[in-house]
């Protein structure tokens, strides 16, 4: 749980059941959720908290963004999961168990790989929600995958600043530099390209597979989550290779991988002239 592997030996209780037999066990759920959250915050954040205690105003900008984003994603994801699945996969549980399962699924999507409900019976809206959470993932310097909470936060703030006609993107009285924004845009676009190419490849090789399940598998692999709707066993050798490559890209990091493949260029003082083009 801490390292976001998602492996378990609970198949001896229920084949491919993960933690579904413990959906109502508060101790198991809270323990696993705590390990997932601790591992997903990142060592930079924990170092900052250790040095400055619980004084939020003194934290680094990254620590503030990570904590705020983590809380929002967990609570928001849990509320939406509950609303979507209350009369579906959660219908057999009590009210308290529904809330517990909703929070667990919201936490585990970023990016642990355990589940306490049957993922194969989720509604399309819930699957999309989980894909979003898997895509965002954890935080930089952690054991989690995804584009990271800081990347999503920077992009969101930058888009808001653009829509409100502000010249700069600011958060907690700090300004994001252009290099940070460029990196965030690059990470988002590179991951989107990985998803698009992988989807085309899998649909071409195995067109009989449901679209929802294929995309779920892709997001889960790229986010190094490990949750599956059950189609992994149906994948051909080539399809599995695609999934393996996605997991590798997700673990190494899309931007790191792209930079490692690019050639080093000499820094030049000469710049091309600027010319504006229409956007949107």
Language-model segments: what does each one mean?
Residues 1-280:
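Membrane-proximal intracellular helices of multi-pass ion channels
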